[in-house]
Regions:
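RNA-binding basic/glycine-rich loop and surface signature characteristic of RAMP-family CRISPR effectors
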Residues: 1-224
Length: 224
């Protein structure tokens, strides 16, 4: 059998990228970039930085859940929401034609060798074929305009850094390389939800790794 499988929608069997995986990776990259101390134990023995300081770039953006400080528990709600990423219709159509026994995916056989005895330890992993496209959405809640530019710049910078890193397991073995394309930025003011104002849309079609002007382009959406 397959030792490591992808996560799928139980109704359609289509693979998807959990928003928690992408958000967690971006948080980790920002923690490393800002040289934060990993002082808070998380699940599976993983440590991360967590505090309730509203000036902390990491926790202000990604949130802090029930961090215990001085005997009190406080929450710092995340300003950013990362939704699950699903296959685009075009990629879905291509992957439906893939032959190999697994719907929409492939399996890769790897082999570990004992450095002393040279005994083989074969394993099989499931992965989405290279070139598959996923559509994802990130929602940023504007709580303070004075930190808006800084927060969005951090998100864009971490997505650019992710292109030189990897998403998911096995990154050092060729898995998880991604590229990002910003399709558009949308601003919905309070009056939009009251039916009094239209949303503002800016078409982007640009990659974070090759566009230093992107923060300005994205922030232009919020110019009233």
């Amino acid at each position: 059998g397959i030792d490591s499988t992808v996560i799928r929608n139980p109704l359609t069997q289509q693979p998807y990228i959990p928003g928690s995986s992408l958000k967690g990776k971006l948080r980790c990259l920002l923690e490393r970039t800002l040289d934060k101390t990993f002082d808070h134990p998380g699940g599976s023995g993983v440590y991360r930085h967590e505090c309730t300081d509203p000036t902390c770039h990491v926790c202000r953006l990604f949130g802090s859940s029930a961090a215990t400080r001085n005997g009190e528990e406080d929450n710092l709600p995340a300003r950013i929401m990362v939704r699950d990423a699903h296959l685009t219709p075009e990629s879905l159509g291509k992957l439906e034609k893939v032959e190999g026994g697994l719907p929409f995916t492939e399996w890769k056989t790897e082999n570990g060798l004992d450095r002393i005895t040279c005994a083989a330890n074969p394993r099989q992993i499931e992965r989405v074929p290279a070139g598959a496209e996923f559509a994802f959405e990130m929602v940023y809640s504007v709580e303070a305009t004075d930190s808006l530019s800084e927060d969005l710049s951090h998100v864009i910078e971490m997505l650019a850094l992710l292109e030189d890193d990897a998403l998911g397991g096995g990154g050092s073995r060729g898995n998880g390389r991604i590229s990002v394309l910003f399709d558009k930025a949308v601003f919905r003011p309070r009056d939009y939800y009251l039916g009094k104002e239209e949303e503002t849309v800016r078409e982007l079609g640009i990659a974070p790794s090759s566009a230093g002007k992107l923060p300005g382009e994205a922030l232009a959406v919020f110019a009233r």
